[in-house]
Amino acid sequence: MSILHVTILTVFPEMFPGTLGYSLAGQALHNNIWSYDIINIRDFGLTKHKNVDDKAYGGGDGLIMRPDVLGNVIEYALSLNHNTKIYYPSPRGSVFTQSFAKEMLKNKNIIFLCGRYEGIDERVIAEYNVKEISVGDYILSGGEIPTLTILDCLIRLLPGVLINQNTLSSESFEKDGEFQGGLECDLYTRPKIWHGRAVPSILLSGNRKLINNWRKEQSRMITKLRRPELLKDL
């Protein structure tokens, strides 16, 4: 049985697993560390045309996904996995972060409702206690790409996905890690000199204490310059 099971509700089932079928996520899928089901929302559509949307009350441009259709889809999904949490990628949602990802993984069964068109009827969110989640202050065509992004983050946190699980502690945003929630330091590899640019000599010194201090100071400088709001937590 997989550590994490995901149910994805979408009108474009062919978009999955997409990039999650490759590299670390793909290998983890093959090894059954995580698993997923796809439910095609159109299978629950109305009329012979399988309509899932309609005009908005109160006017406005765009079509809204119907609550009766989505309700039937969600009820079916919940019948397969009772103990689960429903997430809806939306620009109105709480911003997805590394800490948010860890919180999500407290549930071993997760449902993603991928919206399309102008969005979904608000009553669906209220009825099923749906958690809206945002991947940033920009608009995409639907919820599938944010779902892929969020899942990639979740999957690499699962035990057995990374060859060396300790690498997680030296990444950006890890509050309990080397950089204490800040951005990662600059990274270098061979050759020592490339296009006239040399690797910082301290990294070649072999002095682990000096190197660790350099890495932490670099992290603070980069965080202060690029993401100063993160420093309040440091």
Curated annotation (Swiss-Prot):
Its main location: cytoplasm. One of its GO terms (cellular component) is cytosol. The keyword S-adenosyl-L-methionine applies. It catalyses: guanosine(37) in tRNA + S-adenosyl-L-methionine = N(1)-methylguanosine(37) in tRNA + S-adenosyl-L-homocysteine + H(+). It is found in: Cytoplasm. It comes from the Bacteria. Specifically methylates guanosine-37 in various tRNAs. Homodimer. HAMAP family: TrmD (MF_00605). This is tRNA (guanine-N(1)-)-methyltransferase. The gene is trmD.
